[in-house]
Amino acid sequence: MNILIIGHKDHGKDEVGLRLGQLLGCKYLSSSLFMCERAVLPTLAPLYGYATVKDCYDDRDNHRQEWFDLIYAYNRKSPTRTADELLAEASIYVGMRNRIEFDANLDKGNFDVVLWVDASKRKPKEYTCPWNLLRKTQTT
């Protein structure tokens, strides 16, 4: 069974993925960390001086639009590319943000379950970021 966990920034998606993975006995992966090495670090390291994947990942909040654009470019020819690659390594995918990718993955049947993590009673919603999963059209 493949599970997609989505929600706003800092609402606990990774924590849910970790605990669900422990409960079900399966692996979870953060799509941000997964894509950092594949699509983000090679472009942003020379610009911002990142020496490691961790350096780049830890600074992601300061460059959210760039991250979104780089991952979108990585998936442009195949909107299911990231999910196909991540799901080859784990059953729980945490953090999809692109509507085109979301729809393509649902159409392909990549996910059996989609969970929305909502901590809006204690955390702000994400309105000023490249989050377009809730929109009907691609804006990038």
What are these regions (language model features)?
Residues 8:
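P-loop (Walker A) phosphate-binding loop of NTP-binding proteins
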Residues 38-42, 122-132:
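Short, charged, surface-exposed secondary-structure boundary motifs
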